[in-house]
Amino acid sequence: MRDQPLGEFLEQLAARVSAPGGGATAALHAAQSAALLGMVARYSDGPKHAEHAVTIASVLAEVDVLRVEAVRLAEDDAVAFTAVTDAYRLPKGPERSAAIAAALAGAAVPPARTIAVAERLVALAEVLLPVANRNVITDVAAAADAARDRKSTRLNSSHSLPSRMPSSA
């Protein structure tokens, strides 16, 4: 996904395939949030905001790391859900049941981590808001909104848990 053109990603997202899906999209929302916060921090770094330089530098360093992590989580989510689909295609029996359980447990990890990243991004938006360059302040709000989309990630995460395991896998 990292190097995939946006139009191609959206075509794949719209296709009748298991991945990418909601979890990958939520992680990309977090990546967009981090990118916007990074932009705001960079526009806020300078002589006019010198008294907040340490705070701005700290936020900038963290959001850059979180942006990279969120993109990785989007990729991890797509891989994990492909594993779920592959497990469901196995012939019925104990090996299939075990494969489904393992795949579902693995598929819950990226959304859970995405939630943590998004929550941290909301906190960083709150830190940046009072010290940010006023010309880009609305971008802080857009970043916070993108990160708050983690609620859909909670649904993806809970839907990935072994409760989806069929009784006669």
Regions inferred by a protein language model and the residue ranges of each:
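Conserved phosphate/anionic-ligand binding catalytic regions in large, soluble enzymes, centered on
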Residues: 15-36, 136-152
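Amphipathic alpha-helical interface segments
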Residues: 77-146, 150-151
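Ribosome-associated translation termination/rescue signal centered on the conserved GGQ peptidyl-tRNA hydrolysis loop
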Residues: 37-38, 42
